[in-house]
Amino acid sequence: MNINTDIFKIQSNNVMPSRGKILISEPFLHDVTFGRSVVLLVDHTEEGSMGLIINKPLPLMLNDIIKEFKYIEDIPLHKGGPIGTDTLFYLHTLHEIPGTLPINNGLYLNGDFDAIKKYILQGNPIKGKIRFFLGYSGWECEQLIQEIKENTWIISKEENTYLMNEDIKGMWKEALGKLGSKYETWSRFPQVPSLN
């Protein structure tokens, strides 16, 4: 019996990492932090790369750490990565916030936190507008390129507009589905095949 194992090989789409690109982990990556993750690259230079894992919620709310938010609706926190886990990052669509770093497609990183707090405390919408993270993901010079060559990641050339969607549990599958039918097969592969 011949089994076609090519369905699990990444076919390079010749997309190079850059700010605003999306990294999608391959299905066999058995890593607590990066397994089945979708990472938004917020910076990529010769010195290294920085990203935020978009689809890993934390069992903690922003309201638990920002006292001014104690009496408003819960604001979820996400695990941005294993580095600087005591540092808050925020991805948003609010171009008017001073000091933001434009990512692309209307997404911005950080900016004046007092302006963000004011926006929230005025009762403005948070869902689909702002996502908060503790920590970030980082790669040293050439480390990410090497991991891509080793087929740990595929870089999506799709727009990152779905990254602010609320359904983060299905985001890895959604990101794979945007890559075409070959990768859609990956999305149906069980996380722990031996338990199937």
From Swiss-Prot:
Organism: Bacteroides fragilis (strain ATCC 25285 / DSM 2151 / CCUG 4856 / JCM 11019 / LMG 10263 / NCTC 9343 / Onslow / VPI 2553 / EN-2)
GO annotation, cellular component aspect: cytosol
Protein name: UPF0301 protein BF2109
Pfam families assigned to the protein according to its UniProt record, in alphabetical order: DUF179
Family that this chain belongs to: Belongs to the UPF0301 (AlgH) family.
InterPro entries the record matches: AlgH-like
PANTHER family, alphabetized: UNCHARACTERIZED PROTEIN YQGE, UPF0301 PROTEIN YQGE
Domain of life: Bacteria
Lineage: Bacteria, Pseudomonadati, Bacteroidota, Bacteroidia, Bacteroidales
